[in-house]
Amino acid sequence: NYGHPSEFGFKDIIPLWRAEKWNPDKLVAFYKKIGAQYFFALGNHHDNMDLWDSKYQPWNSVNMGPEKDILKGWEKAARKHGLYFGVSLHADHAWSWYETAQRHDTQGPKKGVPYDGKLTKADGKGKWWEGYDPQDLYAQNHPLSQNSWDNGAIHRQWAWGNGVCLPTQEYCTNFYNRTLDVINLS
């Protein structure tokens, strides 16, 4: 437990991730040895952090965390070992996935204290993430989806139905640009 979500959110896990023992060449060599014919790397997940030197997402693995281009490392190793290389992107659902970060405790000593999902760039003054806007990561400048307080609702809204708050055009354009950015890396 890292503390209350009003004081410690996903953004605060990022600097703890250093990947100092990550060795893509050794791993891909092993995958090849046991029969792999292709290698797919995760470019981003619902956490909305890009694992390459992204032009459209400042919250990326080159600017923070391991300070490495994770995708470039995987790609170089895959090509060296003769494997087809692909990238999987999942940031499209960060929009609804992070809605819990907009909440607050409904009981207990921190009742009503908002979690960190509504923080802005201005809130970073003097913090490790100064100059970065948490909204670029959390994407929570929107109303909660219908039934958002029901932790299971997100799974019923996966296909953008059943009352999910739909992403803005700005969010969709950013996801589109990030997708093209990763396609054009090589």
Please place each PLM-identified region on the residue numbering.
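Mature catalytic domains of secreted/periplasmic carbohydrate-active enzymes
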Residues: N1-S186
